[in-house]
Amino acid sequence: VFSLFLSFSSIMNPFDCPMVSRRGFLAQTGLGLGGLLLGGAGRAGETSPLIARAPHFAPKAKRVIHFFLNGGPSHVDTFDPKPLLSRYAGQLLPGDYRRTERKTGVAFPSPFQFKKYGQSGLEISEVFEKTAAHADSMAVVRSMYAQVPNHEPSLMLMNCGDSVQARPSFGSWLLYGLGAENQNLPGFVAMCPGGMPIKDSENWQAGFLPGALQGTFVDPQYREVDRLIENIRSGHATVSTQRRQLDLLREMNGRHRDSRGADPRLEARLESFELAFRMQVDATDAFDLSREPASMREMYGDTVHGRQTLMARRLLERGVRFVQLWHGAGQPWDHHESIEGGLRAQAGQIDGPIAALMTDLKQRGMFEDTLILWGGEFGRTPSVELAEGGASKLGRDHNHYGFSVWMAGGGIKGGQVYGATDEFGFKAVENPASVHDLHATMLHLLGFDHEQLTYRHAGRDFRLTDVSGEVMQSIVA
């Protein structure tokens, strides 16, 4: 949405005008903690949805970072070891284990070794060996399940709590409940290197919530702030001129609303203009990794995933509430074939950065109030996927009946496993956990009763967890 901000030829980059300091920028624009939150805020009847608010009760976590492995990571190759698959190698699995989206064949043992880590003895695959150093801080939920084995609805369910209807995303609900801590940065940032995941910006949409609560997309394949957030700066007007133009837009939008009714899309676009305007100073600082010590940049790694994870930490410590790190455009974890090479490569891209983030947060005293979530939209089958002619593709099909996520940090009791899939890893059988249960647990850690965090729309109260959801109390510290 930020590419829309400077499509007005006269909205301009203050850095191309006589240089303006941060203090001067805020003074000229009336921004900052005591100033305008949104260009027209302060006018009669207008309030900002970004004003900071208290949760329902004392939170254990203040912020969230979500590592989203889009495509569906295989749980039986990462955090849910199933040694019995080796005994059945080359044989059809007993029971009802062939109800899969595509044709699958015999049992497919994991090509990766699992080891016990930490005092807890948590079993983790060799592909996440560096992350496993933090095993005693992690709670692995091995009994997740979704509704269908398709990417699009499962992405919507995991992100927005509904696989069918367009609903606000988790980050938008969090901003709705808490407001923004830093008014000059987006409260919700979604990073995806190389483009968009499937369903594009619907994954971080505000839905029927105010447009200011939508996620801000950043492409971390770039290093320059002008490319990280497209058109965040321009070259056609002074700061004061930009402010007057945005005020004019807001006035025109108000007239349109008065005569034709509110249009959420128009409001969302204008809010994106306002936020982009405010970000011109703070975003430059937050995304400038050269300000980090060389040792810190080396710890995270000079790779796209290392850089985006370090950017995420810089955003979190500057008050961003929710940062979602997608692995890449499309569905990179969709390992229908050649899973051994593909999964090893992709796990290797994020294993080091995840471990570095956890170490870094602990050193900074941020780990205890930062909730970390790792996972995808579903898991994968314990049986091998077959090609049209019946040959093995050496990969796994989609599996929504059972998969794993893990959490760490803010309010999580680490070094434990919640729930279980069956002996082959096909279906959640012990303490099955729905996506609504996951969302309810996360909201609880952030200080919210998920049943009370509601928004009135179309004549009824909506919530992220719809009409279900139970907190997984045993993993709450």
Set out the residue ranges of the language-model regions.
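Ligand-binding pockets and gating/stacking loops
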Residues: 2-477
